[in-house]
Every structure is written in structure tokens, then in C-alpha cells.
Amino acid sequence: MDETLLVAGPLDVARTLSRYRAWGEDPANRLTDGAFRRAIRVDGGWRAYELTWSGGPDDAKLRVSVPGARRARVLDATLAEVRRLCGLDLDVASFYRAAAADPVLAALVPRLYGLRPTLVPEPFEMLVGAVCAQQVNLTFAFTVRARLVRRYGTPVRGNGATVYAFPEPAVLARARVGDLRRMQLTVRKGEYIVGVARQIVSGALDLSRLAAGSNEDVVEMLTAIRGLGRWTAEWFLARCLGRGDVCPAGDLAVRKAFAHFYNRGRALSERAIRRRAARWGEHQNLAVHYLLAGQRLHAERAGGGS
């Protein structure tokens, strides 16, 4: 079963999805030249799907293929997930109009035109990924996460390729911390991941409540769990729930980007970053992603990689 999505507003698909291989392999989100593959759970079973695209940022077309799907709800669920992965419901056009008043963002928009933040489809996947990324660089975080996905995820075949479904909470709730340690997760990170999984399985952490809560409610619920700090909670708000008025000001990469673009390389306090970001209102999430992408462009030109 195939479907074509016409995109309203600018979308640079390749740039938007590039994070899925910018720092290494992601077996749950396989990006190759011109194709993206992932697995989705529908009606109690896993389905692999493929996303391909054509056109430029102003006339992008997305083609979604779900082999063997015979029910409309399978395709509907897949299309909804693709919308999240490509950030299609984010108001980029409004952000561009607002960015014109900020010299830094106004200069970045033409260079990054059509970039949209990807939204992680599954809350548990987002939380585990955030724990893996704590206090390490993203290349190492992706390496460790890939090992975890291959060990505990479910291989799903489709479109001539295999993609791994991200491990479910019930599976990681039974994982041994020692086994996670052998994947080069620290003991504490292993404990955090198993702990979050067990909270979800037991019902102590209700993921549906997170989507319905205010920003501060979400921060309060997540930071009450061992191993999840405000940094993790704010990235969850930004990259899973798609909240616009969020700036993960404590994140090291965010702090470096603000220092580079707004303070001649000198560090800014978390409070100062939040104060500046507040000027962008509902566009904070998009602004932060453009600053981070702009910082990576600068590093690449300077020969510093990502």
C-alpha cells in the first residue's frame, strides 16, 4: 500500500532527516541516499515502511510505502508517524517571518531553508535516547544506542531491507544492567533505562499523561524519575511532544550555539539563554534547532566536524 503526501510549506527532506546518520548508525531509523526506513506497531504486529521523496524545499513530495498493508488504518498510522518524523505540523513559515527580526536567525534561514526538527514518534524511544546521550558526544551516544537496538529490538523485513523496531518497555524492563554495561553504557545509565522501562510497565509513568500535561507538568513528572533531569525533560518537550515554547538551555550544545552566535564565543548563563530565548515565544524550539544546525555548519567549514 502506497500513498503520496504533498507538503504545505518549505521542507528540505534530506536535511531534516540527516540527523539519523549524522553521528552514526541508527538501526531503528535507517537513512540511506533517498530513502528512510522504520518499523511501526499496528494491530499488535510490526510493519516496516519506506519513505522516499522528490522535489525541492518548496515542492517536496513524500511517498510512503507499507508492503503487505491491507487495512487503511495501517497506512493512516504510518502517515501520522511520517508527519511527526518530518515535522510537518510545525509552523515553519510563521517562524521564518519572526526570524526576520533577529539578525542571527535571519542569516541562518536562507542557509537552512526547509529544515524542520524531527519529532521522535515514541516517548520511550525518546527517553532512552536521551539517557544514552547524557554527558557523552553524540557519536558515542549513537554507537551505544545502536548496540542496544540490535540486542533488544525486533528485526522487521520490508522493501528489501531489514530495520529494527525500537525495544519495547516490557523488554528493557527485564534487561540486566550487566548486559547493558557490556554495551558501554555506564552502570547508572543502565539502571536509569531499566528503571524507566519498569515504571512504564507498572503504570507508575503514564506516557499518555505526558502528552496532555503542561510544560511544567511534564518536567515535574519526568524529573521525579531517577536519571531524568530538566535537560532530558525539556528535550522531550521539544523533540517528542513538539512544544514550541521550549529551550533546553542547560544542554551543552545549546549553550555553545548561543555563545557562538550571541556572545562572541563567551559562555552565557542558563538564565541568560532562557531570557533571550523567551523573546521568540512559540518559536523557541525551531530557533534552537536552527542555531544548532548553524553551529554544525560553522564547525564543518572550520574543519571541526559535528
Describe every region a protein language model picked out.
Residues M1-S306:
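HhH-family (HhH-GPD) DNA N-glycosylase catalytic core used in base-excision repair
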